[in-house]
Amino acid sequence: MDNPIMARAGVRGRYDVIVVGAGHNGLVAACYLARAGRRVLVLERRPLVGGACVTEEIFPGYKVSTAAYVASLFRKEIVRDLRLGEYGFEVLARNPSSFTPLPDGRSLTLGPDAEWTRREIAKFSARDAARYPEYEAMLERVAAFVEPTLAMTPPDLLRPGPRDLLRLLGLGRAFGRLGDRAPEAVELLAGPARAILDRWFESGELKATLATDAIIGAMASPSTPGTGYVLFHHVMGETGGRRG
């Protein structure tokens, strides 16, 4: 017998899985379940799907993202597995990537062009402008270690089997390849963003701009342990083969 609540909603039949909410996470889960042969029903109360990743016309003639500020953290493996590009999915790079207006009329604009970014940072600190490429290279090196683990099933540490031991061995080897960056990687994953930015840079304007990635959506200050990872996590986004 059909569920009376489902019947009132005009939905009939039997399903293996019901996903409540057609946000991007729910849609991805539903697609993978359907690929695995499950009969899936997705329920959404709004007239459009996408959850926080939607574009809406909130002023006549102007369409904006009404929630998500970036979409580059959407995993490339998902785009590939679900063949989203064949259906028109495309992530556009932000240009500029950030704009920081200051009370004295100055501003700091960062973007994908390395020389432009260097000149912008140099307005506040020549030292920071010189160090910024090294900072980005450090983040890239740590990201190369962390990123493959995002789609990995964590090893069972309580009752490890042969596969768990192989995963642990692989993680240990990958971590060892970080070399002298290993302590910095640990701090990025567990420490406060402020300590990291203070060590790399002297300009308050640049540090404030970069710190926004560490606190957005986190309800925490840059001095809170763990915000280093929030800062780092945003670096693992990717658009057209470019991180950020």
Language-model region placement:
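A short, compositionally biased domain-edge/stem linker segment
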Residues: 1-8
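N-terminal glycine-rich phosphate/pyrophosphate-binding loop and immediately adjacent elements
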Residues: 9-157
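Short, contiguous strand/loop micro-motifs
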Residues: 16-17, 180-181, 244
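Ligand-binding pocket scaffold of soluble enzyme catalytic domains
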Residues: 44, 97, 215, 228, ...
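A short glycine/serine-rich beta->alpha loop
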Residues: 59-62, 217-220, 242-244
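N-terminal low-complexity, intrinsically disordered patches enriched in charged
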Residues: 70, 220-223, 227, 235-237
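Rossmann-like flavin
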Residues: 103-226
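Helical element adjacent to the flavin cofactor pocket in flavoenzyme catalytic cores
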Residues: 188, 233-244
